[in-house]
């Protein structure tokens, strides 16, 4: 089975022990599956982008800084995964080529203007993944931002079309925190790849790989 895991930068802590826990889980999954991991930029990206804006950088240049940060995080994770390719691919074709030699391929961002969620969804489509797992800091897709709206309802299961509708609605509201971005949602709809949106813990990743009920399932 081909598994694509989007690991948010906020989920991948700077603590070495937590990185090791994720690495062990990925190694375990890779024993019987081909695993592709796309890592977010997290705090590192935010700090560098903030400084770059203060220094007058364009938004596109800031995107490139964010991409560089995701690739640094990818290298950090690779350091803890013996079976992973030691090279961070810069595009999907290179990722696919590396997967012929390694059970685990870890990459960061690719295109300016694309989040790593969108990158991971596009990668999943490109390699014809069997499952796409979006590991984030929320335990699924909600009707509203659960951190600011106590009446928000969590969805256990959604169709790809419903996901696009919910994300479109949320994205239109200023200042809202969307668990998955609109481009990623549209790619999921187009590719029809089974998707899990989960709270990013090693345990939840294993559950999603096994097809157990966890987070929000989009199918």
Swiss-Prot record:
Keywords: ATP-binding, Cytoplasm, Kinase, Nucleotide-binding, Pyrimidine biosynthesis, Transferase
Superkingdom to which the source organism belongs: Archaea
Cellular compartment(s): Cytoplasm
Pathway: Pyrimidine metabolism; CTP biosynthesis via de novo pathway; UDP from UMP (UMPK route): step 1/1
Amino-acid positions noted as binding ATP in the UniProt annotation, renumbered to this chain: 9-10, 42, 46, 136-137, 142, 145
Annotated binding of UMP, by residue: 41, 63, 110-116
Enzyme Commission numbers on file: 2.7.4.22
GO CC annotation terms, alphabetical: cytoplasm
Primary residence: cytoplasm
Activity regulation (record text): Inhibited by UTP.
GO biological process: 'de novo' CTP biosynthetic process; UDP biosynthetic process
GO molecular function: ATP binding; UMP kinase activity
Swiss-Prot/TrEMBL catalytic activity: UMP + ATP = UDP + ADP
CDD domains: AAK_UMPK-PyrH-Pf
Family: Belongs to the UMP kinase family.
Complex and partners: Homohexamer.
HAMAP family assigned: PyrH_A
Function of the molecule: Catalyzes the reversible phosphorylation of UMP to UDP.
Stated name of the protein: Uridylate kinase
Source organism per UniProt: Archaeoglobus fulgidus (strain ATCC 49558 / DSM 4304 / JCM 9628 / NBRC 100126 / VC-16)
């Amino acid at each position: 089975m081909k598994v694509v895991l989007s690991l948010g930068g906020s989920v991948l802590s700077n603590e070495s022990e937590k990185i090791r826990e994720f690495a062990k889980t990925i190694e375990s999954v890779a024993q019987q599956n081909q695993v592709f991991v796309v890592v977010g930029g997290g705090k590192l990206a935010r700090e560098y982008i903030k400084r770059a804006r203060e220094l007058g950088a364009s938004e596109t240049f800031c995107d490139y800084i964010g991409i560089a940060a995701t690739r640094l995080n990818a290298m950090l994770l690779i350091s803890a995964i013996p079976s992973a390719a030691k090279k961070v691919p810069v595009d999907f074709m290179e990722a696919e080529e590396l997967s012929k030699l390694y059970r685990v391929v870890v990459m960061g961002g690719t295109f300016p203007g694309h989040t790593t969620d969108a990158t991971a969804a596009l990668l999943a489509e490109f390699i014809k993944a069997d499952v796409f797992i979006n590991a984030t800091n929320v335990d699924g897709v909600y009707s509203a931002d659960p951190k600011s709206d106590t009446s928000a309802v969590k969805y256990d299961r959604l169709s790809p079309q419903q996901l696009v509708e919910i994300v479109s609605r949320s994205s239109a509201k200023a200042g809202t925190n969307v668990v998955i971005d609109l481009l990623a949602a549209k790619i999921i709809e187009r590719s029809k790849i089974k998707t899990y949106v989960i709270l990013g813990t090693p345990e939840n990743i294993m559950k999603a790989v096994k097809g157990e009920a966890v987070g929000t399932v989009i199918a």
